[in-house]
Amino acid sequence: MAGTSSQRLAARVREIIARLDAAYGIPQWRPHGDATSELVLTILSQNTSDTNSGRAFARLLRRYPSWDAVAAAPLPELIETIQPGGLAPTKAPRIQAALREIKERTGGYDLSLLKDMPLEEARAWLGGIHGVGPKTVACVLMFALGRPVMPVDTHVFRVASRLGLVPSRAGNAAMTPEKAHFLLESIVPPEGFHAFHLGLIKHGRRTCTAQRPRCPDCPLLDLCPAAARYHPELRPARRRPASARPTR
């Protein structure tokens, strides 16, 4: 029975990916750049939009000629530089600490050693950097190094939860995006990680929004057990038992 259940779940995931590809286009694989740049950009992207984090990253690159310069910059100056990305007083020291640790551990800023390292070792290596969590680790490994991992941001977590792919609890504790990384990696085929990740992000931004999801327009409507919670009119009509029907 477990094998049959797993097969059904795998088929459902493939159907979700196919429908999202049809609705939003098939995501094209485009490596974002070197791994250290991806690490810094992902830290900047925390709790803000892509537009804001992109502006902050562009300002950082314009002001500083090297990662050494970023690591050595006066903290108030770096905070001012990345201000458009939000939470700059938190992100600036986190970026500097990460860069200094990479330099100390590698002698430079080249993280290509992670490309051929066993995957779990690469995860542990990156996750051992102070302030680098599972999402940042996954983004660096997937987008910069092409490793088969599943980044889970708020959009991916929300959509996957509503689709019933992620349970509300993990043991005695609430499920979180951090815990969902490994769960989703176990049910999504590795060749589908990239399409699944980007498809759920697009879907979460355009249709399955945090507030007022547009369920009637959703290409996954018939696959989603949560739709009727937000749009009661979508709940299937319940047939009354024969004993409750009026007699003629």
Protein language model features and the residues they cover:
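Catalytic cores of DNA base-excision repair glycosylases
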Residues: 3-241
